[in-house]
């Protein structure tokens, strides 16, 4: 029996804002969508792999999610670190950086 990754989920307060963020920051686009009366699921993808970022939008939710003290993150690879870093710095979304390790973290509109 083998397992493969399929997606990771982030709950969002403003679906359009989050979709815009992920497209501008990383080039992720909507692959598919599921809508119900109470919530919407949008699956974003990079166009190159099968892995998806699922955005869950609960229609009635107004208060921000408590993300706690967990250090979870979505790790991405780029073939041009310097250009990616410059773009994200210009967007003002870098929230942590470790130059020695060659990594930085960005924060999305919901604090992920």
Describe the predicted segments one by one.
Residues 2, 9-52, 105:
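Core segments of cupin and vicinal oxygen chelate
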Residues 5-7, 69-73:
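Eukaryotic phosphotyrosine signaling hubs
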């Amino acid at each position: 029996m083998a397992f493969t990754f399929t997606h990771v989920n982030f709950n969002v307060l403003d679906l359009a804002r989050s979709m815009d963020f992920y497209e501008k920051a990383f080039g992720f686009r909507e692959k598919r969508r599921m809508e119900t009366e109470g919530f919407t699921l949008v699956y974003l993808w990079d166009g190159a792999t099968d892995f998806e970022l699922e955005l869950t939008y609960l229609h009635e939710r107004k208060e921000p999610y408590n993300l706690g003290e967990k250090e979870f993150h979505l790790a991405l690879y780029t073939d041009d670190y310097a250009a990616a870093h410059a773009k994200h710095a210009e967007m003002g979304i870098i929230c942590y950086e470790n130059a020695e390790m060659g990594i930085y973290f960005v924060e999305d509109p919901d604090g992920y």
